Each structure stands twice: as structure tokens, then as C-alpha cells.
């Protein structure tokens, strides 16, 4: 007898262990109430067998664990479970009478089930139970998945990646994993007052917690500890309040249809096989119509990319009062400029470019935006990287447009994507871009009138590696690799590569029409390429695109990390053969000058040694501000004058106001710089970056100033997106979800219950404000403490610091800063001086300064 009972006990334990705890929990909480109706046909035979054994085992125990009391469970939940138990027992009565009898015997005789109980779950809230089990059957589907798992394991074990070793801290987008045992019992009312003196409800606290967590990028563990702290402060009556991740996601997550996942063929990479949102995910086997390959699609498949609804994000911008005001101010300013055409053709913004005027050369006014994509590693040591598809709105002020970068898609992969994958990645964006161009979105203007606003892409801001992939052309290291002209390139044996020297006859410029002609030639003749064009591209379908000149000049990678770095290496590298090579003593003298500079606060990064790996902003500051003073009298005059041409080109094209005469001068300077570059440094130095400097002015004419079409804001946004990752699991999904959550709070698209909550959440997403300030007129703000001083027989207030037109000035008496200097000024007369005092006299701001005459000599040099 004892042997048989122990044998039964062991078999029961085997059945109990065969079913994951998550499945048991969901079964008990009512998620599988209609299992036989909805799910049985969708299960694999392995999962179905486990489930039948588990349900039979649960009927025998009547859902009463030996170590727990039946009365401790929620009444409605127990009632519901017993109903399911009775129904399932009836189904198996013929085959398992003993189980049914045991179940009836154990069940409490006083209990009478309520057959009219309402179901607290809808069908669309139920997740399929076979995801985790069927995925386990396919763990060895591909080596790419194994590599991904290895990277994730290494990431979770490595402290260098910034993650704690506690797995509870990792974020998870698993919908079911976030449902706790009592999520569905409605154990508390969100409108219950939690803090009486401030009249804050539980709903308010949840909003504050979510806003705080998003702003300061708390992990799941950090947010949970914050919740525990708040409950501790609230008092013992709120100890059992369950503010779980599931409840927060239900309230603050974006709608499920705004983030979709697109699975493509893993063999040919030429067709999207399946597109679905995460909530409605099912395992499928899809056959590719291009290569007839069967692709198994599971939750662990890596051959997919994510799309985020752009229309949804644009509507959020218009729902923000502050951003809406900026948008309509921009529209009005563009309308005024179009009515008052300036004969001097001054370039101020994108609305002065040729492509913008071509787009808006109709009755409809289109708001434009820039597009960019670039790769970055997801982790410090892993192989996987991600390519975000980002959008920069051009219809707000220049300061705001760089802060409102929108996210349209994410592609994750272990190597650089091919042109075929890039076409698929852009295909979903192209469909939405067409709808925004043709139909637009319905918004309200400042008068609260309903209007239709339409959008059109203007410029594509990508580097020289991504550009040919999107255009489906040869790269810069091949023949006909130039993006904007038909320079064939020539092979230079000394460097074993393609170079682009000046030619006797200038190469023909590319155009949209000539590119289409090359595509047609390749298609009809089955050639590998025609003048660098390898075939068709999906981007041709984007409205109003110029497949050549819509791709703007990228000065970050071309000039800052390209030409400038190449020149500096020729001057300072020990292996350099240049005639302008510097001695070690000269290099040290340049370093000494550089590190002794105390810049203004407009320059956010202090000078660093050129031996270190500099950021793009630091190289930009070096070229525009530091280089000429540091190189003077050290670098040969011929090389310095040649280098100063590059400085003048970059300075002019980054101005906020550029005249046509200045553009013509830049064209001449660029031609002169490239020509002498070949003379001074040889044909082997005529790289692609040097060659395309000849096209920079034409690119500015087509798409607008360099400052608006650079990749700087997109590179900065990539860094911000990486900060949204709090764990190694499903990192792309974390980025997409948290980006939309962050945009909700930034634009005020949150259902606030009071102004107190709204003001707090709005304030934490703003930059730090001045604590002590005093306005003097419209343009001057005095900051900090002041003291009285008698000047010309009258007492005046004297300050040490002020802000004029957004620029910080301080006197020599301001001693808090050591490595920056904002005391120097230049008058309109050309004189230089140093500020002694900043005086407020009868609502006027007066600067008492000391004239510095020795600056005149340096200016003449």
C-alpha cells in the first residue's frame, strides 16, 4: 500500500513539475476559463498532453494545496476555479470517474457555486498558452538565436554593462510574466485617497511613479522599490496595495497596434512574411514566394524588425499646446517669407531650399521632416546592434526640432544589413509616408478649428556607408562610388584602393532622372551595375523624393571625422611622409596651447588632448575655434592657409543666414582646397571624403543649411534610446515601448487628474531653471546675488552675471568658474574688452569693461 501511494505521489509530482508555474498561475486566475473552446485546437501535441495531465491532476486536488487553506483564496476566484473544475470533470466523466469522485469528495460540502458569475477577462486579453512550450521545442532552430542568447547571458553576468546581477531588475516585455497572482481580482480602487493632506489617489501615485521612472530611467527593480517606499510612507493600511508592473503597463503603455513586428524571409531577405502586434502573436510556418523557403516564426525568431506608428506620434505633437504654438508660428513665418520673396536669395532654413520649394509648389502646404538611420551596438560586449529609423520634424523652431526626434522603426541584427533588408525595413515607413502625404492627419489650429495637415519627407541624413545601401549603389570604395556625380574613380596601387583625383573635365552631376535611367538599363540588360547603380530601390516610391539630392551632405562624418582627422594625422603621425610633418616638440606646443584655453560656456565641452578619442562636437570646436590660434607659427604657413579654407567653408555653411555671394565663395574655396590638397598631399590622399567636398554647396542649395541636415541630433538620439534599456531581454521592444511612454509625458498626453500632478510631471521633463533671476527689458536677465554701488552720485545694483540674448556674460569678480571665461566681449566698433561690472540702472543694463588693445595685433594676423 505504501509503495503504491509513493508511486502515485511521484507520478503526481512529475505531472506537476511538467507544467510551468506560469501556466498553473494563469489557469488558477481564470485566464484559461474557456480553454477547450479557444485554445485546444491551437496547441501542439506536446503542450496538449501536458495540459490534459495537469488539468486531471488539478481536479484530483480540487485546487487546494496541502499547505494552504481554501478560505484564504479570493471567493470569486475560487468559485470560478471550481466551476471550471466541475465542467472539465464532466467532460472526462466517462474516462476518469475516479478523478471526479475524488474531486467531489475533497470539495467543501457547504460550498455552492454561483453559476451567474461574470467573467472578468475578455478574449482579446488572453495570451496563448503554447508560446513558451512550443518555443522550447525549437531552441536549436538557428545559430543566430544561440549567439543572441550567449550575448544576453554574457551581458547579464558582466558588471561593465551597467546591469545589476539581480534578474528581477531586468525589464521584460513578456505580457504574461508581468501578471501577478492577484492582478485580476480588483482588490483595490484606483480612486482611493492615499494621502489625505494632498488629496492624492492611488491613480495619482501611479502617474507620479511612472513619470518619475521614465524621466530618470529606473529599472523594474528600482521602480518596485520606489513603490514600496511610497507605501511605507502612506501607512500600514496601504501595505497590501498591489501597484504592479502589469497595472502600470495597462494604464500607460501605448495601444497595441502602434508597435508592430515584421518577420522577413531568413534565406533571401526579400519578402516580409508576417506582420503582427505582440499581443496577437501566434506561431506560424510561412513559405517565401521569392525562394520557396519555409520559415518558422516564433517568439525567438531574430529575422524581424519593429515599426512604430509615425502618425500616432505626430498627433501627439499637435496635442501639446507648446509644440502646437511653435508649429503654427513656423507655418505663419513661412507664409510671410513666401509672400515677400527676397531678391538676395538668403538661406536661413529648410524653407529656403530648392527641394522644399519644389514640394510646396502647389496649393497644399506640406510640413517636412528629415529621416535618418544609423547603427550602434546594443551592448558593450555583445554582437547584436540596432538601427533606429528616426524622424526630425522641420516644422518647429530649430532648438525644439532637435529635441523632438521621433522613432519609426528598429532593426536589430548581428552584422551590417544588406540592401535587401534595408528595402524591407523602409517598406513599412514608405506606406505610412504615402498616407501622410496624400491624406494627412486631422488636427485643430490655434482657433480650435479642425484642419487637415499633410507631411512630406525632405532630406535623408545618413553617412557614406548607409547612403549607397539605401540608394542601392556601389559604395565609395568601388568605381562610380560618388553619391552626387559620375566620377569613375581610379585605382591607386600605393594604397590599394579607389581614389577620386581632379579631372580635366568635371564629371557629370547625377540627377533623379539619370538615376532612373541607370536603373532601367540594369533591369533590362541584367548587368551587375550601371555607372554605380546596382538596381531599383524601394525609396523611389516615397513622394517627392530626389533619389540623388534628397540625401544631404553629412559634415559630421565627412569633414569632422574625415578630412580634418586625415589632415591632422598627416601633420602629426610619426609614419607620415607629408612635407608638412611636425616635430614632436611642435605637437607638444600645440597640445599646450589647446589645454590652456578657457572657452566660454557656449562651448559645452572643455578642451581635451588630441591624443584622446574626441567626440564630434569636440572636433567641431577644434576646427571652428581652437585650430587656427593653436597652429599659428607652428604649422607651415602654406599648410595653414590651405587649412583655413576648410575652416571658412564650414563656418559659412553653419551660419543661420547665408547669402548667395557666400555660397559662391564657398564653391570657389572648396575647389581651391581640393585642388591644392592633391598638390600638397598627393593623389593617394584624394579620398572619397575629400572629393565630395566639391558637392557640399550644391547640397546646401538643395536641402538647406548644414546645421539642420546633419546627423548630430540623430547620433545623440541613439544614445538616448540606449539609455532606455534596463535589461538584456527584448531590448528593441523596451526601446519602442519606453520611447512612446516618454513622448506621452513630454507632450502632456497623459490623463492627469489634477494640476498638481500635471505640473510635477511636466517640470521633471524640463531643463533646470534659474533659481535667482531678475528681468531687465526683453533681452537681459540678471542672475545671482547683487549689491549696491554708488555710480555718478546714484545708487545702482551691481550683478556679477547676466544673460543677454541667450548668451552668458559675467564679470571678473565672478569666481565660481575656473575653466571657462565669459568676461571677454567684442564691440561693434571692433574693440575687445574685459567686463569689470554688470550694472542695472533705471531698467537699463550697463557693462563696465576694460579695453584690451593687444588683441588688435592678433586680429590683424
Segment roles from a protein language model:
Residues 274, 278-284, 291-335, 434-616:
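Domain-level detector for long, ordered catalytic/regulatory cores in large eukaryotic signaling
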Residues 3-10, 86, 112-114, 127-130, ...:
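Terminal interaction-prone segments of large eukaryotic proteins
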Amino acid at each position: 500500500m505504501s509503495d503504491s501511494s509513493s508511486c502515485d505521489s511521484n507520478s503526481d509530482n512529475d505531472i506537476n513539475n511538467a507544467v510551468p508555474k506560469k501556466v498553473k498561475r494563469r489557469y488558477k486566475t481564470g485566464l484559461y476559463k474557456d480553454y477547450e473552446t479557444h485554445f485546444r485546437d491551437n496547441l501542439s501535441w506536446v503542450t496538449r498532453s501536458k495540459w490534459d495531465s495537469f488539468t486531471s491532476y488539478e481536479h484530483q486536488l480540487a485546487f487546494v494545496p496541502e499547505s494552504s487553506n481554501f478560505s484564504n483564496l479570493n471567493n470569486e476566484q475560487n468559485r470560478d476555479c471550481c466551476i471550471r473544475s466541475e465542467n472539465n470533470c464532466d467532460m472526462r466523466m466517462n474516462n476518469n470517474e475516479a478523478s471526479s469522485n475524488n474531486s467531489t469528495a475533497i470539495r467543501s460540502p457547504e460550498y455552492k457555486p454561483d453559476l451567474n458569475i461574470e467573467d472578468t477577462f475578455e478574449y482579446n486579453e488572453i495570451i496563448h498558452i503554447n508560446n513558451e512550450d512550443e518555443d522550447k521545442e525549437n531552441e536549436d532552430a538557428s545559430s543566430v538565436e544561440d549567439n543572441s542568447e550567449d550575448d544576453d547571458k554574457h551581458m547579464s553576468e558582466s558588471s561593465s554593462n551597467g546591469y545589476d546581477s539581480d534578474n528581477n531588475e531586468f525589464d521584460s516585455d513578456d505580457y504574461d510574466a508581468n501578471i501577478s497572482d492577484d492582478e485580476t481580482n480588483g482588490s483595490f480602487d484606483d480612486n482611493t485617497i492615499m494621502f489625505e493632506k494632498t488629496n492624492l489617489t492611488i491613480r495619482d501615485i501611479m502617474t507620479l511613479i511612472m513619470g518619475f521612472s521614465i524621466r530618470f530611467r529606473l529599472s523594474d527593480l528600482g521602480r518596485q522599490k520606489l513603490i514600496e517606499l511610497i507605501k511605507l510612507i502612506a501607512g500600514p493600511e496601504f501595505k497590501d496595495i498591489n501597484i504592479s508592473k502589469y497595472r502600470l503597463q495597462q494604464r500607460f503603455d501605448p495601444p497595441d497596434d502602434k508597435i508592430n513586428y515584421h518577420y522577413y524571409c531568413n534565406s533571401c531577405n526579400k519578402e516580409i512574411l508576417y506582420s503582427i502586434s505582440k499581443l496577437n502573436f501566434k506561431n506560424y510556418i510561412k513559405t517565401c514566394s521569392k525562394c520557396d523557403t519555409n520559415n518558422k516564426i516564433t517568439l525567438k525568431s531574430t529575422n524581424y524588425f519593429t515599426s512604430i506608428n509615425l502618425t500616432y506620434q505626430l498627433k501627439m505633437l499637435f496635442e501639446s499646446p507648446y509644440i502646437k504654438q511653435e508649429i503654427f508660428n513656423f507655418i505663419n513665418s513661412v507664409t510671410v517669407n513666401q509672400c515677400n520673396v527676397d531678391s538676395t536669395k538668403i538661406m536661413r532654413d529648410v524653407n529656403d531650399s530648392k527641394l522644399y520649394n519644389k514640394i510646396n509648389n502647389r496649393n497644399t502646404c506640406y510640413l517636412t521632416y528629415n529621416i535618418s538611420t544609423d547603427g550602434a551596438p546594443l551592448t558593450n560586449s555583445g554582437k547584436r546592434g540596432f538601427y533606429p529609423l528616426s524622424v526630425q520634424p522641420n516644422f518647429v523652431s530649430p532648438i525644439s526640432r532637435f529635441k523632438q526626434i521621433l522613432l519609426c522603426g528598429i532593426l536589430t541584427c548581428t552584422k551590417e544589413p544588406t540592401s535587401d533588408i534595408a528595402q524591407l525595413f523602409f517598406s513599412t515607413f514608405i506606406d505610412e509616408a504615402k498616407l501622410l502625404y496624400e491624406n494627412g492627419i486631422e488636427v485643430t489650429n490655434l482657433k480650435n478649428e479642425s484642419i487637415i495637415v499633410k507631411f512630406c519627407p525632405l532630406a535623408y541624413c545618413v553617412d557614406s556607408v548607409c547612403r549607397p545601401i539605401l540608394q542601392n549603389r556601389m559604395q565609395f570604395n568601388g568605381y562610380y562610388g560618388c553619391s552626387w556625380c559620375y566620377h569613375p574613380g581610379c585605382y591607386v596601387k600605393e594604397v590599394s584602393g579607389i581614389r577620386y583625383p581632379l579631372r580635366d573635365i568635371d564629371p557629370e552631376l547625377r540627377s533623379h532622372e539619370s538615376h532612373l535611367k541607370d536603373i532601367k538599363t540594369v533591369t533590362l540588360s541584367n548587368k551587375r551595375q550601371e555607372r554605380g547603380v546596382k538596381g531599383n530601390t524601394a525609396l523611389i516610391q516615397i513622394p517627392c523624393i530626389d533619389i540623388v539630392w534628397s540625401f544631404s551632405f553629412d559634415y559630421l562624418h565627412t569633414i569632422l571625422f574625415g578630412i580634418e582627422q586625415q589632415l591632422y594625422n598627416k601633420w602629426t603621425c610619426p609614419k607620415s611622409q607629408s612635407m608638412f610633418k611636425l616635430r614632436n616638440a611642435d605637437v607638444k606646443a600645440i597640445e599646450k596651447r589647446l589645454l590652456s584655453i578657457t572657452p566660454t560656456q557656449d562651448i559645452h565641452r572643455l578642451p581635451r588632448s588630441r591624443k584622446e578619442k574626441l567626440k564630434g562636437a569636440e572636433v567641431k570646436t577644434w576646427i571652428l575655434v581652437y585650430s587656427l590660434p593653436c597652429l599659428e607659427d607652428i604649422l607651415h604657413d602654406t599648410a595653414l592657409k590651405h587649412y583655413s579654407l576648410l575652416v571658412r567653408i564650414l563656418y559659412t555653411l553653419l551660419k543661420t543666414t547665408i547669402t548667395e555671394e557666400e555660397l559662391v565663395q564657398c564653391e570657389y574655396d572648396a575647389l581651391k582646397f581640393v585642388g591644392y590638397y592633391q598638390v600638397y598631399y598627393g593623389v593617394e590622399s584624394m579620398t572619397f571624403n575629400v572629393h565630395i567636398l566639391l558637392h557640399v554647396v550644391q547640397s546646401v542649395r538643395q536641402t538647406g543649411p548644414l546645421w539642420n541636415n546633419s546627423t548630430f541630433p540623430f547620433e545623440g538620439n541613439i544614445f538616448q534610446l540606449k539609455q532606455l534599456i534596463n535589461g538584456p531581454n527584448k531590448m528593441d521592444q523596451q526601446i519602442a515601448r519606453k520611447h512612446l511612454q516618454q513622448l506621452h509625458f513630454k507632450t502632456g498626453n497623459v490623463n492627469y487628474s489634477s494640476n498638481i500632478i500635471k505640473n510635477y510631471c511636466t517640470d521633471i521633463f524640463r531643463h533646470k531653471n534659474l533659481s535667482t533671476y531678475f528681468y531687465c527689458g526683453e533681452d537681459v536677465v540678471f542672475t545671482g546675488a547683487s549689491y549696491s554701488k554708488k555710480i555718478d552720485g546714484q545708487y545702482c545694483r551691481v550683478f556679477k552675471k547676466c544673460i543677454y540674448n541667450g548668451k552668458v556674460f559675467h564679470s571678473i569678480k565672478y569666481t565660481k568658474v575656473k575653466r571657462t571665461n565669459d568676461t571677454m566681449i567684442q564691440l561693434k566698433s571692433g574693440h575687445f574688452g574685459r567686463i569689470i561690472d554688470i550694472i542695472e540702472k533705471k531698467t537699463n543694463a550697463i557693462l563696465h569693461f576694460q579695453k584690451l588693445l593687444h588683441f588688435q595685433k592678433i586680429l590683424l594676423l
